[in-house]
């Protein structure tokens, strides 16, 4: 057909190697988004070729004397039968990409797009920038976390490309082959000239032709729907779909619905659902043909001409090509086997079989490389930045180092953020315990997806033993924490269930705060022992009742101060016995009555006065009545008032859960933020006031003046509040808006928080320059500079600049 029958059509060249190998026959299969593979049968007059020297060598198989053919690397070599003069050899020719199938890996990629991941892997295999090309029409998002898990590099690359709808094909020359990635039809080149269709009549045509061509139609999915869930936008319905154009032929409604769709915004979901539909329908119309045209290469457009069905005379995208060639004329003698062992009448020349789709139908690689699934759970170690003992984000997520991850550095970049499962999680309530750096945790994977890890628990190991030795303490249930940073302290709740030794043990390393909104009832079946190392403060807003059924023994090592606002009533069943080492001084503002039913005695210095039913007896060396002298005096009272107890640490209640309605798009409820207070004590309000330094102050709440905070101002008159105190004051203002008061000498001022916008001071000066006080409903301030921030904020409901323009 191309050359006389006794001339060879096919030839093999090996880079950097002189040889006498001749192509006896070959077969090959190539397709879009898959490495090609050609099996070559060769003969040589040399019976001892060095097979190792052939391996991995670039080679070019020419189909025609003009140089059309396939370039690749020698992937396999074998020596076959030997005759008197010729020895058979077999070579396998593949692209460089095929070598990726021989390297399996488990690794993590973070914040990279699919093209970036693919390029990284290619260059690790020596496929450099001049050997591959990306011709993409779409910008692909970064994958925050992408795992290659127990799969070959080739499987991983093909899987990622198929998930995104990216295809690849090869372009060949005698010196190299080029790997081209694309995502639309424009990336596919067109073959040089049309190829005529000539029905296979058994005759040999003058030019390469298409001998057979058929078209089949198949039922395929007609619409796709994808849905996903984003925990950062839990009330947002993430769903996207795609269907054929309205003018497409009517077909049954066949939907492909999938969850999770692996997207976090609708635009991305729309693209993925569109690519999925294009993938389903890529081969709905599939052409199949047979030809002897050696120019056919997958990933190229073939133009068919002279077909009796006119609409088929068009461009067709070659998706797969099966090549076959034989040239028995290279044999100059018989060897053990010959080339006639064929099941058909093809004995010599070149032929191919191909699959093709219409040019306007987008090609998308099928999902033939499923994502590996993680079977069961794994363990990992919690990681963080150097020096950090606890590392988490606003959701309590942590990072981990997987045992299989060879590239991770065990730091705050070793994985994505992993959510931590809790036994209870509500809207501002529930339970949370953050796994700490160094802890070994149990990791599950949502639907077995290695890209979606989730911490489900913690486990002990030899280097991190349990709090109490086991099994000696197997009856103990313990929750024990560790002070951070640095350790050297702990909080603990321990429950001992050993028979006869049952116990609940609580240890607080520093403070213990309790808030009980209603009653507290405590019953102690035996003894109770309280030891307070420093002061004890109690305040009862109503009555206090004590009943002691036995004796009461109280010892005070220093003074006892008792202040009773009204009357004190003391009832003694038998006797009142009091002894003072030096003095007893009783003083009444108006009168004092000492009454005894039978006898009253006053005794001092050997003298006494006794009053009883028989009369009054006065006994002493000398009795003076109205004879001068003066009464003795007492020391007088020097009462000290008690300090009020500090308030227990407070928090805000959670909020009821609101079920999400399917199909609705609602925003997240606004979270209540904490105020940050900046308070200064002054003799008068406003910029003209002088700061009151080192002045005691109290912040109280409600009519009963419940103490919230107290302290002393600093050298600038400011209230120095730490984070805990800021939170306590913020919570008090949220619980009782408008009923929280700052009290200091001569002042009682309501605390009414407002949000201070950035740049407020500059805005305030602008308001003063425009005499903004006139807008306060005619209530002019006593001094022009007096602070009215709360009022000004309420006046300006919109943009301050717009408000100024309106006033001007």
Swiss-Prot record:
**What coarse category fits the chief subcellular location reported for this protein?**
secreted
Give GO cellular component annotations, separated by semicolons: extracellular region; type VI protein secretion system complex
Q: Which domain of life is it from?
A: Bacteria
GO biological process terms on file: protein secretion by the type VI secretion system
Kindly list the places in or outside the cell where this protein is found, as annotated in its UniProt entry: Secreted
**Record-annotated disulphide pairs:** none
UniProtKB keywords: Secreted
Q: What happens when the gene is disrupted?
A: Deletion leads to a complete loss of PldA secretion.
Q: Which Pfam families match?
A: Gp5_trimer_C, Phage_base_V, Phage_GPD
InterPro entries assigned to the protein according to its UniProt record, in alphabetical order: Gp5/Vgr_OB, Gp5_Vgr_C, T6SS_RhsGE_Vgr_subset, T6SS_Vgr_RhsGE, T6SS_VgrG/RHS, Vgr_OB-fold_dom_sf
> Transmembrane segments in this chain: where?
none
Q: Which family does it belong to?
A: Belongs to the VgrG protein family.
What's the stated role of this polypeptide?
Part of the H2 type VI secretion system (H2-T6SS) specialized secretion system, which delivers several virulence factors in both prokaryotic and eukaryotic cells during infection. Allows the delivery of the phospholipase effector PldA to target cells where it exerts its toxicity.
Descriptive protein name: Type VI secretion system spike protein VgrG4b
Q: Which organism is it from?
A: Pseudomonas aeruginosa (strain ATCC 15692 / DSM 22644 / CIP 104116 / JCM 14847 / LMG 12228 / 1C / PRS 101 / PAO1)
Which gene name does the record give? vgrG4b
